[in-house]
Amino acid sequence: YNIQKESTLHLVLRLRGGMQIFVKTLTGKTITLEVESSDTIDNVKAKIQDKEGIPPDQQRLIFAGKQLEDGRTLADYNIQKESTLHLVLRLRGGMQIFVKTLTGKTITLEVESSDTIDNVKAKIQDKEGIPPDQQRLIFAGKQLEDGRTLADYNIQKESTLHLVLRLRGGK
């Protein structure tokens, strides 16, 4: 290795259960992180902040199409070595809205005012598995049209939309 006197060596401890995972950003950049299966999503966001300077509250991590929750661990999501997570930035101006189903269940969504109704239906599909073409969204008594934005309908943070299912074959 041609190590000469007074050289400095660096000792890197590889923790038991330590592994590398990759985080891909929307710009296509890939970040490599050293993690353990027992790390929480919070921990992972903190490591991304250390490397990239992005505050954790602006980070959304996606794996296998699911948004990862802060308190859960990598092991909970079966994220193994060399898995790739996707990092989506939650822009300032992001907000939560609620979607209430006819069964009385309430779904919380992270959205932006500029999101279209299409986008919102796609988020509902991610969370609930309901295809967008079966979803009808109602706010303040009005049915919401796909191409319009939340801002168009003056839907603000913590607004509640109502989800009605359009059954196949129904008009």
UniProtKB/Swiss-Prot annotation:
The residues joined by the cross-link Glycyl lysine isopeptide (Lys-Gly) (interchain with G-Cter in ubiquitin) are: 66
Propeptide positions: the record gives: 171
Any one Pfam family match given in the protein's UniProt record, by short name = ubiquitin
Could you confirm whether the keyword Repeat appears in this record? yes
In chain numbering, cross-link Glycyl lysine isopeptide (Gly-Lys) (interchain with K-? in acceptor proteins) is at 94
Under Gene Ontology molecular function, one entry of this record is: mRNA binding
Q: Which InterPro entries match?
A: Ubiquitin-like_dom (IPR000626), Ubiquitin-like_domsf (IPR029071), Ubiquitin_CS (IPR019954), Ubiquitin_dom (IPR019956), Ubiquitin_ubiquitin-like (IPR050158)
Where does the protein principally reside? cytoplasm
Can you tell me which family this protein belongs to?
Belongs to the ubiquitin family.
What this protein is reported to do is described as:
Ubiquitin exists either covalently attached to another protein, or free (unanchored). When covalently bound, it is conjugated to target proteins via an isopeptide bond either as a monomer (monoubiquitin), a polymer linked via different Lys residues of the ubiquitin (polyubiquitin chains) or a linear polymer linked via the initiator Met of the ubiquitin (linear polyubiquitin chains).
Q: What else is known?
A: Ubiquitin is generally synthesized as a polyubiquitin precursor with tandem head to tail repeats. Often, there is one to three additional amino acids after the last repeat, removed in the mature protein. Alternatively, ubiquitin extension protein is synthesized as a single copy of ubiquitin fused to a ribosomal protein (either L40 or S27A) or to an ubiquitin-related protein (either RUB1 or RUB2). Following translation, extension protein is cleaved from ubiquitin.
Write the protein's name. Answer: Polyubiquitin
Q: Which organism is it from?
A: Hordeum vulgare (Barley)
Q: What is the lineage of its organism?
A: Eukaryota, Viridiplantae, Streptophyta, Embryophyta, Tracheophyta
